């Protein structure tokens, strides 16, 4: 896949959460919320503090979903990122 976000935008792939709770209860797919963290796949030329392969946390409704090569990604502005997981 060749995709370069413009300006201060990032291309992010969601990171799936665990399917069970701490007590061992299995959460069905239709009851799960979309994850609010993801891996940075590509960054635009104006993004300064976030790098490719960083895992970031963002708002539940941030970004726009797109499909590239059959996979789902989010495109969002860097201001939608709350922080980087270290």
Swiss-Prot record:
An example Gene Ontology biological process: chaperone cofactor-dependent protein refolding
Any one Pfam family match given in the protein's UniProt record, by short name: Cpn10
SUPFAM superfamilies per UniProt: GroES-like
Gene3D superfamilies according to UniProt: GroES chaperonin
GO terms assigned for molecular function: ATP binding; metal ion binding; protein folding chaperone; protein-folding chaperone binding; unfolded protein binding
Recorded coiled-coil stretches: none
Primary localization class, coarse: cytoplasm
Keywords: Chaperone, Cytoplasm
Recorded superkingdom: Bacteria
Subunit architecture: Heptamer of 7 subunits arranged in a ring. Interacts with the chaperonin GroEL.
Function: Together with the chaperonin GroEL, plays an essential role in assisting protein folding. The GroEL-GroES system forms a nano-cage that allows encapsulation of the non-native substrate proteins and provides a physical environment optimized to promote and accelerate protein folding. GroES binds to the apical surface of the GroEL ring, thereby capping the opening of the GroEL channel.
Name of the featured protein: Co-chaperonin GroES
Source organism (scientific name): Sulfurovum sp. (strain NBC37-1)
Gene behind the chain: groES
């Amino acid at each position: 896949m060749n995709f370069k976000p413009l300006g201060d935008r990032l291309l992010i792939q969601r990171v799936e959460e665990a399917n069970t709770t701490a007590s061992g209860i299995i959460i069905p797919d239709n009851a799960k919320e979309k994850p609010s963290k993801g891996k940075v796949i590509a960054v635009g030329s104006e993004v300064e503090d976030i790098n490719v392969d960083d895992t970031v946390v963002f708002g539940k409704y941030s970004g726009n979903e797109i499909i590239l090569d059959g996979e789902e990604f989010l495109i969002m502005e860097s201001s939608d990122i709350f922080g980087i997981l270290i």
